[in-house]
Amino acid sequence: SSTAASSAPTAEELCDQQVAEYIRQIEQLQARSEKQLYSIMLSAYSEYMSHPVEERSLVTKVSAVLSKSGELTAAQNQCDAEFAQIMAAMRKTLRENGRDESIADEAEKTYKQKKNALIKELTSQAYSGGDGSGQSGRWLAEHADGNIVD
């Protein structure tokens, strides 16, 4: 019977597995949310491109982006809410197993850094160009399709 007991995962191993699963969920959430935000921005870009060439300007581009601000905010808020749920579950698992919460702190820090970098990147795309070259559209399409190269 000692062989059966030794093959069963220990509480520590189970905790490690749960934490790894939470990290995986966070990564999936971020990938899904990024794709959603890029898609919303791409729809704003399509709206901008639907204007005749002579009407395409940075003002028109920004206006198209602003028309999507509600969608962008809702997507961001949904992502933040899901992230908060995952973090609460991860911290609870760590506490219940007498573990240090530094891995959760690090996950939260990384999430915030990635979120801020994405917001900065999207803002940069929204407030640049407007010259009708299509550079922003190509960039957004690549990211919305998930062909992101780090």
Task: Label the model's feature ranges.
Residues S2-D150:
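Soluble, non-transmembrane alpha-helical interaction regions
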